[in-house]
Amino acid sequence: MKIFVGNVDGADTTPEELAALFAPYGTVMSCAVMKQFAFVHMRENAGAVRAIEALHGHELRPGRALVVEMSRPRPLNTWKIFVGNVSAACTSQELRSLFERRGRVIECDVVKDYAFVHMEKEADAKAAIAQLNGKEVKGKRINVELSTKGQKKGPGLAIQSGDKTKKPGAGDTAFPGTGGFSATFDYQQAFGNSTGGFDGQARQPTPPFFGRDRSPLRRSPPRASYVAPLTAQPATYRAQPSVSLGAAYRAQPSASLGVGYRTQPMTAQAASYRAQPSVSLGAPYRGQLASPSSQSAAASSLGPYGGAQPSASALSSYGGQPAAASSLNSYGAQGSSLASYGNQPSSYGAQAASSYGVRAAASSYNTQGAANSLGSYGAQAASYGAQSAASSLAYGAQAASYNAQPSASYNAQSAPYAAQQAASYSSQPAAYVAQPATAAAYASQPAAYAAQATTPMAGSYGAQPVVQTQLNSYGAQASMGLSGSYGAQSAAAATGSYGAAAAYGAQPSATLAAPYRTQSSASLAASYAAQQHPQAAASYRGQPGNAYDGTGQPSAAYLSMSQGVVANANSTPPPYERTRLSPPRASYDDPYKKAVAMSKRYGSDRRLAELSDYRRLSESQLSFRRSPTKSSLDYRRLPDAHSDYARYSGSYNDYLRAAQMHSGYQRRM
């Protein structure tokens, strides 16, 4: 007969000791001791009954009363209940009696701090779970739930409760409030095949989230940060929403000019044109005080600008179109009227009726407040050529600056310029109607001029490299090169015109730093090729190189506009700051140089906090302050550095590192 002996301490109870205990009652065939119970096989049925009667409750060890009963094969379908967080003071008998009040208990096994109770009926098991879950037993709240492991099937307990190698998958029963660990934890399997080998509390499964993110060393930095640091553009671009770049820059929150310029070579101008419906060259020049969308298509003054110029939107003209396209035509090759922008004498002075000169340029240009005229005039040679920085700020007060212009017509216009203030345009539609040449072009649009809002286009014209925009035209243009405008114009004049508060309206310090910094200062072809749609790049590349250089425009003019950053005038600066992590600029043919260069880049005392790329990866440098690179374990070993001492002395000097290390450095073993 098979006798179950419960509450046995398997650690200090041997099968021989147990067999000797049962021997007086009959022949003991075998004895198997598990961790907390044992099975004794006796030959005679009567001897087994006598042993059960005599030894049930017997204390084999002080304080451990044996549970001796006939081993019963478990019914084929029992309901297995997992009981977690069982107090060490709670015996299987006590637990069994607790559950037996709710129904018949087939089996109750306590393993360390959890137990399994097998009940005969499902209803009883569910009632027991409902009533006992969270109940305090011997000072600990037990966690009771239906075991998710399939019910044990088999004739006896001994075979099923063996294998000590099966450890619980997880489950910290010290936290009963977790509502059970049934889904992830296999206490059942743990106990089902094992009541042995549990030397510690079962561990709860690793949660699906991870407290620590991927190492920042492996995380790719966001691409945008490499385009151009946000600081490349003046804070005014980022901070001021009213800059009339408006839609263009406000729409791209990172607003790094690098991004803006890379996609739209003509920069914000394209965007601002894209945003305005009438989107004609006229619109920006005609009323730069107007917000781009306030001019209707009817108000488009393409006629006044070139008469012959197609109504192609400035978007295309500024965007990526070839040099011959509409705007470039209008600026570069177009006859007298739009040569106006390159050959300013003709355009401003003796300009055709359809142009600005005779049309009382006062009215047409003065419409633009100082802010908006900025962009358009800043690019036009004659108008700014002799002008001082102060003169570029307000056209209303600039009789003198216009007198100095080469065109005779400006001397005549000094009175209208002096007389009219930028503000006066909103109130003088008559000025437009009365102009001689405005009949076709402007006379029909007084409302458009009068009603235009005061948001200047200045942002779009000033902020974008105005040069870029009209450069084409200037490169291909006739006699009057840029020299008047950009070359002769003092640095102060240029900066004033671009960055003075009046010029930009709301942006006091918005020098062209960012726009110009993103393109190289001297070579037009290089700067355009680097940041333009291919076809436009081709057209720019094809145009005379003297666009910037030959016209006598010194790089100083640009450098003074806080473009000192661009040291190398002939190469486009890299879109992100080079660091010691950047690949070498050129391959080193000399192996000594290569080894030394690599050892410098991967030297073991370089802290990540000193490498600006990693600084950019993290909000705070503190996370990297204590994590030096471990070059001794680094997989990027130096190349073949063993041929002579001079070659590897630079890279192997971490053996002598202690003399060089600063005190804050922690050697990581």
Swiss-Prot record:
Transmembrane segments: none annotated. It is found in: Nucleus; Nucleus, Nucleolus; Cytoplasm. Signal peptide: none annotated. Residues 287-303 have a biased composition (Low complexity). Keywords: Acetylation, Cytoplasm, Immunity, Innate immunity, Isopeptide bond, Nucleus, Phosphoprotein, Repeat, RNA-binding, Transcription, Transcription regulation, Ubl conjugation. The modification Phosphoserine is found at residues 161, 220, 242, 244, 256, 272, 280, 520, 523, 527, 562, 582, 618, 620, 623, 627, 643, 649. GO terms for biological process: centriole assembly; innate immune response. SMART domains: RRM. There is a cross-link at K126, K135, K138, K149, K153, K164, K600 (Glycyl lysine isopeptide (Lys-Gly) (interchain with G-Cter in SUMO2)). The modification Phosphothreonine is found at T206, T572. Pfam families: RRM_1 (PF00076). SUPFAM superfamilies: RNA-binding domain, RBD. Residues 148-175, 193-232, 284-303, 569-590 are annotated as: Disordered. The modification N6-acetyllysine is found at K164. InterPro entries: Nucleotide-bd_a/b_plait_sf, RBD_domain_sf, RBM14_RRM1, RBM14_RRM2, RRM_dom, SRSF. One of its GO terms (molecular function) is mRNA binding. PANTHER family: SERINE/ARGININE RICH SPLICING FACTOR. May function as a nuclear receptor coactivator, enhancing transcription through other coactivators such as NCOA6 and CITED1. Regulates centriole biogenesis by suppressing the formation of aberrant centriolar protein complexes in the cytoplasm and thus preserving mitotic spindle integrity. Prevents the formation of the STIL-CPAP complex (which can induce the formation of aberrant centriolar protein complexes) by interfering with the interaction of STIL with CPAP. Interacts with NCOA6, CITED1 and XRCC5/KU86. Interacts with SS18. Interacts with STIL and interferes with its interaction with CPAP. Interacts with gamma-tubulin. Part of the HDP-RNP complex composed of at least HEXIM1, PRKDC, XRCC5, XRCC6, paraspeckle proteins (SFPQ, NONO, PSPC1, RBM14, and MATR3) and NEAT1 RNA. This is RNA-binding protein 14. It comes from Bos taurus.
